[in-house]
Amino acid sequence: MSAPLDAALHALQEEQARLKMRLWDLQQLRKELGDSPKDKVPFSVPKIPLVFRGHTQQDPEVPKSLVSNLRIHCPLLAGSALITFDDPKVAEQVLQQKEHTINMEECRLRVQVQPLELPMVTTIQMSSQLSGRRVLVTGFPASLRLSEEELLDKLEIFFGKTRNGGGDVDVRELLPGSVMLGFARDGVAQRLCQIGQFTVPLGGQQVPLRVSPYVNGEIQKAEIRSQPVPRSVLVLNIPDILDGPELHDVLEIHFQKPTRGGGEVEALTVVPQGQQGLAVFTSESG
């Protein structure tokens, strides 16, 4: 499996916690409409324009969980550069000429340019099953000032008390905007979900929280297609005659010249010979 495909699948897994919450909402909607439940829940993923903003990552390891925006990691080979222009029309003009000659004082650099395409997930199909011993706790205010450990401890104490409808907590996990709690005995999760609303003391304030069923979701099928990145181009086969900073300046000057079809450069990252890089793409709104 290619590295870009691995990166796309990894980004998909990072979104799984958010998708679990959405699966629960979809199931509730079916109940309201009187529809019969189904095991598989296919839905389309909205198209998200991507842009490289100059962030790179040296270590190929990616965090196991992601709290906010979609991120796709694109490997950059040795002797290459990634350029993002302010205007997508400039990128189109640059790509019309597949080989560029960069004039320098003592020599010329001949480099190739090509469009950048990233693998994007277009459709996800997941199987879902309500967990009998786990719940999802939501409603945490952004102003809450507690560390992860403090928050989990306080929730375990509160929902571990039988007078609050709870029981012994044996699993706890912080998710994006929510917390998953697992209980040692049957019936506790169902009882808490029936109550639904709780006021929990957190950080010196009384915080209203919602408890809902936790959905175990597993990706069954993912359709992937290549999507062009309209404002970015790859520069390849850069010879090893300049160091990184000097090469960066030479490329930026060349590709900003209107006479070469260039224009304003928003971000430029160079990977010299003997090195490797990882470009991080986020959504346009990110």
UniProtKB/Swiss-Prot annotation:
Coiled coil stretches, renumbered: none
Protein name, entry field: Interferon-induced 35 kDa protein
UniProt keyword Nucleus, yes or no: yes
PANTHER family, per database record: INTERFERON-INDUCED 35 KDA PROTEIN, INTERFERON-INDUCED PROTEIN 35/NMI N-MYC/STAT INTERACTING PROTEIN
NID domain boundaries: 81-170, 183-266
Region feature (Leucine-zipper): 5-26
Single biological process term from Gene Ontology: positive regulation of inflammatory response
Gene: IFI35
Family matches, as InterPro entries: Nmi/IFP35_dom (IPR009909), Nmi/IFP35_N (IPR009938), Nucleotide-bd_a/b_plait_sf (IPR012677)
Compartment(s): Cytoplasm; Nucleus; Secreted
Tissue: Expressed in a wide range of cell types, including fibroblasts, macrophages, and epithelial cells.
Keywords: Cytoplasm, Immunity, Innate immunity, Nucleus, Phosphoprotein, Secreted
GO terms of molecular function: identical protein binding
Regulation: induction: Up-regulated by interferons IFN-alpha and IFN-gamma.
Organism: Homo sapiens
Subunit note: Homodimer. Also interacts with BATF. Interacts with TRIM21. Interacts with NMI; the interaction is direct and is facilitated by TRIM21.
PTM section of the record: Phosphorylated. Dephosphorylation correlates with the formation of a complex with NMI.
The UniProt record lists the keyword Cytoplasm: yes
Family: Belongs to the NMI family.
Chief site of localization: cytoplasm
Biological role stated in the UniProt entry: Acts as a signaling pathway regulator involved in innate immune system response. In response to interferon IFN-alpha, associates in a complex with signaling pathway regulator NMI to regulate immune response; the complex formation prevents proteasome-mediated degradation of IFI35 and correlates with IFI35 dephosphorylation. In complex with NMI, inhibits virus-triggered type I interferon/IFN-beta production.
